[in-house]
From Swiss-Prot:
GO cellular component: cytoplasm; nucleus
Highest taxon, organism lineage: Eukaryota
Name under which the protein is recorded: Cyclin-dependent kinase-like 2
Keyword Kinase: yes
UniProt comment concerning the protein's domains: The [NKR]KIAxRE motif seems to be a cyclin-binding region.
Location in or out of the cell: Cytoplasm; Nucleus
Disulfide bonds: none
Domain Protein kinase, first and last residues per copy: 4-287
Active-site residues, Swiss-Prot/TrEMBL: D126
């Protein structure tokens, strides 16, 4: 990991931290996830192994790609491509919502990336604005830092469960262990209205409050989920809220078009078995109207190629810079400087630089000789022919025999250049990154969800859902201990 220069801290959590770094050889900016000492903590080791195995098989234009995996002193380091902008940043810049075409392009790529994960029997389970990166070219990258959260001011406390509650499907809230890919589709539905309107759809303050928000909009839970709710010891003594009058999406957001409302409703079906697959969503009228899907697919490929070229140009620029520095260094070393060494022979100390008046012919000869020589001499700018006297008493400070009668210039040892850059190591101290929060997010989200894992030993009742990426039960286990504490999952989609 010595080849990476640490540029600052991006986020941290109970299992490690994420750092912004620069590859010293190529100049490429990357994000490095640094786990805690995994060999001493079985939970950290399990999470690290699961994420490494999953990400190694995921290569897609709409997923942040894993570039390298390293282990040093019992710690695992995951090197990712770095993208420093998220959809959450957009929502904070535009609190009243994003433009229609922007949302269309974002959603198309989000669904495309999630669909790729689902095709590999992987569910993300933590789809939310801050986990969706956007490159400078507009390419969306789903990321899953899991334990990493944006740093905030000291004293603000939140749990990992609170941070993602707003986008959790009802089956997760009631404790259903037979959930599947439909939980990601639910999160997509939450994003649809949030990106258009600039406010979270279901901003619950607790699990029961979250269910209340959902039921107020979509109606009662399905019988199976109601039964699971009353059997769940977490909700002992608590009853589901009674909804006298619903506020459906079309009434809550009358300015949204019918096609947008229809897309959101399909994703937010209260019954997970009736939510569509990602492939079906991409064929929805929201994407097919006016030939958007076909047109944007071609545009997206150009954006991806542009990002790839930018990375390549960055590497070439860094290499050219290094070559130039090397050439400049060699050029400096090749220069012969006329410097009087105070520790040299006493006769040398008495050497003086004289301007000799000569004939015009002598001047022309001296000028020609000056052009032919690569040596650089100290001279009066008003004359082109200088002479050092006495030439026979000069000595070379580098102990190399030189015939000074032929070359009266003083030779000195080449200067020693220290070109090594002093850069902090990967474990050096890191600065903090602060992100300005505006609008309703200050009160509802930031105050509760800003400082990550201040109490890492305190687990939420539904803590079993806090791992961000897992696989469905159809495939072989990723590792012997990778799913010991996770709920079993079935294929629902």
């Amino acid at each position: 990991m010595e080849k990476y220069e640490n540029l600052g801290l991006v986020g941290e959590g109970s299992y490690g931290m994420v750092m912004k770094c620069r590859n010293k050889d190529t100049g490429r900016i990357v994000a490095i996830k640094k786990f805690l000492e995994s060999d001493d903590d079985k939970m950290v080791k399990k999470i690290a192994m699961r994420e490494i195995k999953l990400l190694k098989q995921l290569r897609h234009e709409n997923l942040v790609n894993l570039l390298e995996v390293c282990k040093k002193k019992k710690r695992w380091y995951l090197v990712f491509e770095f993208v420093d902008h998220t959809i959450l940043d957009d929502l904070e810049l535009f609190p009243n919502g994003l433009d229609y075409q922007v949302v269309q392009k974002y959603l198309f790529q989000i669904i495309n990336g999630i669909g790729f994960c689902h095709s590999h029997n992987i569910i993300h389970r933590d789809i939310k604005p801050e986990n969706i990166l956007v490159s400078k070219s507009g390419v969306v990258k789903l990321c899953d830092f899991g334990f990493a959260r944006t740093l905030a001011a000291p004293g603000e406390v939140y749990t990992d469960y609170v941070a993602t509650r707003w986008y959790r499907a009802p089956e997760l809230l009631v404790g259903d262990v037979k959930y599947g890919k439909a939980v990601d589709v639910w999160a997509i539905g939450c994003l649809v209205t949030e990106m258009f309107m600039g406010e979270p759809l279901f901003p619950g303050d607790s699990d029961i409050d979250q269910l209340y928000h959902i039921m107020m909009c979509l109606g009662n839970l399905i019988p199976r989920h109601q039964e699971l709710f009353y059997k769940n010891p977490v909700f002992a003594g608590v009853r589901l809220p009674e909804i006298k009058e619903r506020e459906p999406l079309e009434r809550r957001y009358p300015k949204l078009s019918e096609v947008v409302i229809d897309l959101a409703k399909k994703c937010l079906h209260i019954d997970p078995d009736k939510r569509p697959f990602c492939a079906e969503l991409l064929h929805h009228d929201f994407f097919q109207m006016d030939g958007f899907a076909e047109r944007f697919s071609q545009e997206l490929q150009l954006k991806v190629q542009k990002d790839a070229r930018n990375v390549s140009l960055s590497k070439k620029s860094q290499n050219r810079k290094k070559e130039k520095e090397k050439d400049d260094s060699l050029g400096e070393e090749r220069k012969t400087l006329v410097v009087q060494d105070t520790n040299a022979d006493p006769k040398i100390k008495d050497c003086k630089l004289f301007k000799i008046k000569g004939s015009k012919i002598d001047g022309e000869k001296a000028e020609k000789g000056s052009r032919a020589s690569n040596a650089s001499c100290l001279h009066d700018s008003r004359t082109s022919h200088n002479k050092i006297v006495p030439s026979t008493s000069l000595k070379d400070c580098s102990n190399v025999s030189v015939d000074h009668t032929r070359n009266p210039s003083v030779a000195i040892p080449p200067l020693t250049h220290n070109l090594s850059a002093v850069a902090p190591g990967i474990n050096s101290g890191m600065g903090t990154a602060t992100i300005p929060i505006q609008g309703h997010r200050v009160d509802e989200k930031t105050k509760k969800c800003s400082i990550p894992f201040v109490k890492p030993n305190r687990h939420s009742p539904s803590g079993i859902y806090n791992i961000n990426v897992t696989t469905l039960v159809s495939g072989p286990p990723l590792s012997d201990d990778s799913g010991a504490d996770l709920p079993q999952m079935e294929h629902q989609h």
